[in-house]
Amino acid sequence: MTVLKMTDLDLQGKRVLIREDLNVPVKDGVVSSDARILASLPTIRLALEKGAAVMVCSHLGRPTEGEFSAENSLKPVADYLSKALGRDVPLVADYLDGVDVKAGDVVLFENVRFNKGEKKNADELAQKYAALCDVFVMDAFGTAHRAEGSTHGVAKFAKVAAAGPLLAAELEALGKALGAPAQPMTAIVAGSKVSTKLDVLNSLSGICNQLIVGGGIANTFLAAAGHKVGKSLYEPDLLDTARAIAAKVSVPLPTDVVVAKEFAESATATVKLIADVADDDMILDIGPQTAAHFAELLKSSGTILWNGPVGVFEFDQFGEGTKTLAKAIGESQAFSIAGGGDTLAAIDKYGVAEQISYISTGGGAFLEFVEGKVLPAVEVLEQRAKA
C-alpha cells in the first residue's frame, strides 16, 4: 500500500489541514472518553514541531447536515486540546472562505458536519477545504471507510494529500496481521449476530488457523453443531452458513458455558456443560474449562486478531471468559491487534492495553478492512501518491 506520509514531508511554513477522528462522547459539556483525542496528539504535535500552520478538523455526532447544533459542537474538544497541548487552541466556526493561522499555531475547525455537502462528498465543499491548505493530512482511520468531503473529497483536490502517522500505523498493523500473518493465526470474532459479522467471518476463515466465536455468534455455531442453546440469542436461519464456515476453518466450540434465567445485572450465573443447557437457560459467557482451552490456543499463536468480547462482560458474573482471554492475549508472544468499540471497553476494564501490539481506533473501518473492502479515504491517497 503506497501512500505519501506526513512524516516524510517538509512542512516548514506550510498550511496543513489534518483530518482527525475526534468524535468523542461528551457529557455536560465535558469530554467523557478521551482515547481518540489522545491518539491524535502525536500527529498534531509533530506538525507543530515541523513548523506548520496547523488546522485540525473532525466531525462529532450526527447533527442535521448544514445546521449548527450546540450539542454537537467541538468546543469541549477544543478546551481539551488546549489543556493537552499546553497552548490556546481556538475553535473557528467560519473557516470555509479562509482563515488566518500563523506557522507554529494550531486551530480547531468547528464540526465539519455543520457544512452542507460534507456527507454527500460535494466537490464544491471539498474544493473549499483544499483551498485552505498546502498539505492535507488524513489521519482519521475511524472514518476512512466513508467517502465524505473532509475524508475523501478534499484529498482529491488538495495540492498534496498524505497519510498521518496514526492512519499509517493502522494500515501497517492491519497489513501485518492480515497480509502475511505469523503462524498460527487465531481470530476472535464475537457479537450478537452472525449476520452483522458474516463478511468478517468469511474473510478470516480463509486466512486464520483457528476462529474463536463468542456471544450470539457462538450460540448460532453451537446450534448448527446440534447443541441445545435454550432461549439464548441465536439465528436459526443462518445454521447452514455457520456449518459452511466451520467446514473451512477450525472453529473450537465451548464445552461449558455460563447461563442465567434472565438477562439482567442481578441475574444468578451458573456454570454448565454444554449438554446440560436447559430450555429456559440463556448462555451469557463461556465457561472456565472453555476459557482455559481458548487461552492456551491464544498463548501458542503467532498472530491474534480480536474483535468482540465473548460474554456479557458489562455484568461481572458474565465477564470471566472475556477477562481470561484478554489476559491470555496480553501474555502471548503473538503480534496482536484488537478493534471495535466493545473490544476497547473490555481492554480498558481488564487493564491489558499495554500488552496488546496494536489497538485499532476504528470500529466500522477496522471491520471493513478485515473484510477486504476498499476504504475510500485510503484509496484516494494511493491514487494521489501514484499521480
Swiss-Prot record:
A GO molecular-function annotation: phosphoglycerate kinase activity
One GO-annotated biological process of the protein: gluconeogenesis
Which superkingdom, per the lineage?
Answer: Bacteria
Give the keywords, sorted.
Answer: ATP-binding, Cytoplasm, Glycolysis, Kinase, Nucleotide-binding, Transferase
Subcellular localization(s) per the UniProt record: Cytoplasm
Binding residues annotated for substrate, in chain numbering? D21, L22, N23, R36, H59, L60, G61, R62, R113, R146
Q: E.C. number, please?
A: 2.7.2.3
One GO cellular component assignment for this chain's record is: cytosol
Membrane-crossing ranges are none
Q: Which PROSITE patterns match?
A: PGLYCERATE_KINASE
Q: Which residues bind ATP?
A: K197, E314, G340, G341, D342, T343
Q: Please give one Pfam family short name.
A: PGK
Catalytic activity reads: (2R)-3-phosphoglycerate + ATP = (2R)-3-phospho-glyceroyl phosphate + ADP
Pathway membership: Carbohydrate degradation; glycolysis; pyruvate from D-glyceraldehyde 3-phosphate: step 2/5
Q: Which family does it belong to?
A: Belongs to the phosphoglycerate kinase family.
Known partners and oligomeric status: Monomer.
Name of the protein: Phosphoglycerate kinase
Q: What is the lineage of its organism?
A: Bacteria, Pseudomonadati, Pseudomonadota, Gammaproteobacteria, Pseudomonadales
